[in-house]
Regions:
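The feature marks proteins involved in alpha-glucan
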Residues: 1-32, 68-172
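Substrate-binding/active-site clefts of carbohydrate-active enzymes
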Residues: 149-328, 337-357, 363, 374-375
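Conserved alpha/beta catalytic core and glycan-binding cleft of carbohydrate-active enzymes
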Residues: 118, 350-351, 355-507, 514-518, ...
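Glycan-recognition and catalytic regions of carbohydrate-active enzymes
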Residues: 19-24, 494-514, 524-593
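Carbohydrate-binding surface patches
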Residues: 29-45, 565-609
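C-terminal accessory region downstream of the catalytic core in glycan-modifying enzymes
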Residues: 52, 477, 481, 527, ...
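Conserved, mostly hydrophobic/aromatic
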Residues: 39, 89, 146, 200, ...
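C-terminal beta-strand-rich structural cap/linker in extracellular carbohydrate-active enzymes
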Residues: 41, 84-87, 628-649
Length: 649
């Protein structure tokens, strides 16, 4: 029996690649006349498939051996219409025999233990063939991140009870707070807010929630993948029937597209729920990165990490992402711990997505870091290697995040909006999407995701209160924190790059100071739709900034020249001010923007550049641009703790 170190050497040898490289179809290839099952298992001594009528329980209705078809592939043909049959494989290697679901399964029963043969055409909702990705120019992109569960779990959401926390909640039209008919929630709220992309936290089948049990006391974000090509069953109305989760996931995407909103899928290929998983049961050790002694590398911090550089692991990764893009019409992909993927694999994926109809508009961005030390010996897809990545692969910019609100690992550390001395230098870097910085200059501003909050760490509201108070009252309306919240939004929503924020940031979302709520209670994690009404002024501030940004396309420019067109003013610290001219013919409402940030608690006089300047947004209202606001020349005064925006008329 080989040791793990010997298997590592064999898997990474040219001889192994020559004998086992396979670029054909894997999984269940369905047709009405019969289904081919193919499993790549080059270390197997034998493979058997067991068939079932149900996805959970019930007797086996037949077992068939798979035959070796070459290049490490085992296969069998099942004649007749097999739609709705469930199966798993029994794989025998030198380690013994194990039962596993199909790594390429596209549907599954409860908890994904059995895969399902599925006619995907039968899962298409009416009108699915006509569903198209919304055409969203770079200048109008903005991303709102949410969990399917959090979106509608609140009883006040107005969503029917059976759909709360489910895919179908996104399809319900006209929801309002407690059904009052006045205050929009869920999809109606998103349409009014004006956001153009929803980033969904993991929607593939994950392992930490038992789909066979009530969900009232179960919760997890889902960063623990079990079946990569199968939607999560707890988000469906019937996890026992494999086709239901597929259909309802498509219905969700279709409804968002109909509202003009793109869907970004948060994908977690960097690790799996546990090392005993569908990939490792099929081919022990192959899919997971190893140290020189054969032990598992743990750059994910979760006990295993995906070996993207190994050819058949890379194929699996590419096949899976492309499947979601094609079958589910996904508009973008956010990569968890992208620093655990190699640059070559990420660039290959970008090239493959670009080949799809409309594929060049599919977003790709990720976290440019790792969760620990990794054995990846090729160039990592991280911030240090940004210059090696395709210029349409973006990164979350923690420099922007920390400069604006303070470090995320120290709850009490302030940032620019809380008055941290010296932080104004990094604010200037953030405005130009770091294209004029020597820290890590990107190819274009489009590579930078500008943000201050995401699902990880503290909500923005909680962070602001933790910096300001020893014992915060998170549920209270705090005017000082509101001003800082508006300033933070006013900064990153006027920075170049792709603006992104955590759902509910715009209504002071709180998790009561919990900085890592991945498995906290549903009540703590869900969106509190009552706060959207309570903090409606803050919601309107975000809404106005989104509209203002859309009215000045150059803020969302992806060309390398635009950041260099920003002229920064020589102002007394810690004020930051800058001017950006519009591009000729780009449809901008104003000839230029002048933007000023004032983090101090005093009014600050400034002198405007020559010309007539309309006040578009101040520290309390971001919708002045929609009406007949003041026209100024010469002197102006900045309100305390404010972002103030002027447009050249």
């Amino acid at each position: 029996m080989k040791t793990p170190a010997q298997w590592k050497a064999w898997f990474e040898s040219e001889e192994f690649a020559r004998q086992t490289d396979y670029q054909g179809l894997l999984g269940a290839a369905y047709s009405p006349s019969g289904t081919h099952l193919r499993l790549w298992a080059p270390t197997a001594q034998s493979v058997r498939v067991d068939l079932y009528r149900k996805g959970d329980g019930g007797a086996c209705i037949g077992s068939l051996p798979l035959s070796p078809w070459g290049q490490g592939v085992w296969g069998v043909y099942l004649p007749g219409d097999q739609h709705g049959k469930y199966y798993h494989f029994n794989v025998t290697t030198e380690w013994g025999s194990v039962t596993t679901a199909d790594p390429y399964a596209r549907a599954a029963g409860v908890n994904g233990a059995r895969s399902m043969i599925v006619d995907l055409a039968r899962t298409d909702p009416p009108g699915w063939e006509q569903d198209k990705r919304p055409v969203i120019p770079a200048s109008k992109r903005s991303v709102w991140e949410v969990s399917v569960r959090d979106f509608s779990q609140d009883p006040a959401s107005g969503v029917r009870n059976a759909w709360r926390g489910k895919f179908l909640a996104f399809t319900q039209q006209g929801t309002t707070l407690n059904g009052d008919g006045v205050h929009p929630t869920c999809l109606s709220y998103l349409k009014r807010l004006g956001v153009r992309y929803v980033q969904l936290m993991p929607i593939f089948d994950f392992g930490s929630v038992d789909e066979s049990r009530p969900l009232t006391r179960q919760y997890n974000w889902g960063y623990d993948p079990a079946n990569y090509n199968v939607p999560e069953g707890s988000y469906s109305t019937d996890p026992a029937r494999g086709e239901v989760r597929v259909r309802e996931c498509k219905q969700m995407i279709q409804a968002l597209h109909a509202a003009g909103i793109g869907v970004v899928m948060d994908v977690v290929y960097n690790h799996m729920y546990r090392f005993d998983n569908v990939l490792n049961r099929a081919v022990p050790f192959y899919y997971f990165r190893q140290n020189e002694d054969g032990s598992l590398s743990n750059g994910s911090g979760c006990g295993n990490e995906f070996a993207s550089e190994r050819p058949m692991a890379r194929k699996y990764f590419l096949d899976s992402v492309l499947y979601w893009a094609q079958e589910y019409h996904i508009d973008g992909f956010r990569f968890d711990l992208m620093g655990l993927y190699d640059v070559e694999t990420m660039n290959l994926l970008r090239a493959e997505l670009d080949k799809l109809p409309g594929g060049r508009d599919i977003l790709m961005y990720g976290e440019p870091w790792q969760g620990g030390s990794s054995a990846l010996h090729r160039y990592e897809a991280n911030k240090n290697n940004l210059a090696m990545l395709n210029d349409r692969i973006g990164i979350f910019c923690d420099d922007t995040r920390d400069a604006i609100k303070g470090g995320c690992f120290n709850a009490r550390e302030p940032g620019y909006v809380e008055g941290k001395p010296g932080s104004f230098w990094d604010i200037g870097g953030a405005v130009a999407a770091w294209c004029r910085s020597d820290k890590f200059p990107p190819h274009t501003p489009g590579q930078i995701v500008s943000y201050v909050s995401a699902h990880d760490n503290f909500t923005l509201w909680d962070k602001l209160l933790l910096v300001r108070y020893e014992r915060p009252e998170f549920g209270a309306v705090d005017r000082a924190a509101l001003a800082q919240n508006r300033l933070a939004a006013g900064i990153y929503l006027t920075c170049m790059g792709l603006p992104f924020w955590q759902a509910g940031e715009e209504f002071a979302r709180t998790k009561k100071g919990q900085g890592n709520s991945y498995r906290s209670s549903p009540a703590l994690n869900r969106l509190d739709w009552k706060r959207a009404e309570q903090f409606h002024g803050l919601v309107d501030y975000y809404r106005g900034l989104i509209g203002l940004r859309n009215a000045f396309p150059r803020l969302g420019a992806v060309d390398r020249a635009s950041p260099n067109a920003i002229a920064f003013f020589d102002l007394e610290q810690p004020l930051v001010g800058w001017r950006l001219p519009a591009l000729p013919g780009d449809g901008a409402w104003w000839g230029a923007l002048c933007v000023y940030y004032n983090p101090t608690e005093q009014e600050q006089p400034i002198r405007l550049p020559d010309g007539r300047w309309k006040l578009l947004s101040d520290g309390t209202s971001s919708s002045l641009w929609r009406g007949d606001s003041r026209i100024l020349s010469g002197e102006a005064v900045l309100a305390p703790v404010s972002a103030t925006i002027f447009g050249l008329v």
